[in-house]
Regions:
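Bacterial N-terminal signal peptides
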Residues: 5-17
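Cyclophilin-like peptidyl-prolyl cis-trans isomerases
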Residues: 2, 20-226
Length: 226
């Protein structure tokens, strides 16, 4: 089964030029076994949408610039009333959904520095939340969530051109069923320009609120039976 993802490197910004980068075809990869380590600091955010709630753990320690930017939008209630407006379904269970402020002058904050995955150690596995951008350093208030492993969106310094990838900054921990419903939602056959034509949700899916929520305490460790 071939999972062709080349167009995805071109579709991640709203009303901005497409990226020059062409992503390679991703292949599912099993995570390497790692020794037990303290879990990095995270902040949990709930996106309440009209199709259900998506909870995300935002990596404030590993991706401080990008996570801090997202939390400024959350804490300022700038995402309340915005929408998931785009869904790209490459094949069943594989694609992405995009949301954000869409350059709304009343909501948008200044662009942030690009924080590549080579710096954060994060990767675009399924359920990753990451920033939409054109050139590096142009990300602001639009983001996407992956469905399926898309490690071609990570930084690849050994490749030519714009090889810095996208800035992942968290992971969906609850509500991937909602993400899937948004991915499958109806799209307009005529809206959108260029590669985005046919990818615009119609109707859009509203983000009613975006709020910090308490992170559940870790589950108690059960000692092995003697």
């Amino acid at each position: 089964m071939i999972r062709h993802i080349a167009p995805l490197a071109l579709l991640l910004l709203c009303a901005t030029p497409a990226l020059a980068q062409v992503a390679a075809t991703p292949t599912p990869t099993a995570p390497a076994a790692m020794p037990d380590q303290p879990k990095p600091t995270v902040v949990r955010v709930a996106l309440q949408t009209t199709l259900g709630t998506i909870e995300i753990e935002v990596e404030t320690e590993r991706a401080p610039i990008t996570a801090g930017n997202f939390l400024r939008y959350v804490d300022g209630k700038r995402l309340d009333g915005t929408t998931f407006y785009r869904a790209v379904k490459v094949q069943e269970g594989f694609g992405l959904i995009q949301a954000g402020v869409r350059n709304d002058a009343k909501r948008v904050l200044p662009n942030i520095a690009h924080e590549p995955t080579t710096k954060t150690g994060l990767s675009h596995t399924t359920g990753t939340i990451s920033m939409a951008r054109a050139a590096p350093g142009t990300a602001s208030g639009d983001f996407f969530i992956t469905v399926g492993d898309m490690t071609s969106m990570d930084a690849h310094p050994d490749q030519p051109g714009d090889n810095l990838g996208f800035a992942a900054f968290g992971k969906v921990v609850s509500g991937m069923d909602v993400v899937g419903r948004i991915l499958d939602a109806p799209k307009s056959p005529t809206e959108g320009e260029g590669v985005m034509k046919g990818q615009m949700l119609a109707p859009t899916i509203a983000i009613v609120t975006a709020r910090r929520v308490k992170t559940p305490p870790p589950a108690p460790v059960t000692p092995p039976a003697l």
